[in-house]
């Protein structure tokens, strides 16, 4: 994605975002949209009018993109990573470029909707379904751990390191267990811990837990011939803004496993 930003002094800056960085940007924009909806609910028409007025001015000042900027992208303007520093009414993005230069980009909440619409339009124009699929699969949960439960009493786990700012965009940790029909009856063979904002036991959560396997090579290999017949989930308690350690994730998951295992054996 080419993102062209016009500064207040009229000077323009160009940024190039490849798929993983674009996914991070969309994650940030999505989280701010939730804040904006809340603000609309609280402030009503006054805030709605402010949004409309601002967006009209924004559209009138959209900078022109030159053909050369698309066909000959500057490698040094390619963003390699984004770190979010959230504010009350704006997001400050700390950008690391390909040449290791660091810059900041401030996005006001009033600009969020227009930016999302612009990105959606660009994706629609390109028509790359694989990219759209990749981006949408990274929007509603973050992988933390996957576990092979066939190696009891030892736990064979895989960790997926995530940045704190990203984990903070989601509301709670979710423990998931996958139960399969085996020759010895129903058995829980694998599990996962993810962070999500999908309401517990909702259709959205159901969508998340069924897609975890696809995102994990470990689980995908385990369930290639053994599809889950039942999926169990539980919220792992955590304080807002505090990241859980390995033990704080896997110990509750194991306790949940023992509880469900006992129920299946009863």
For each feature predicted by the language model, list its residue ranges:
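Positively charged, low-complexity terminal tracts
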Residues: 1-266
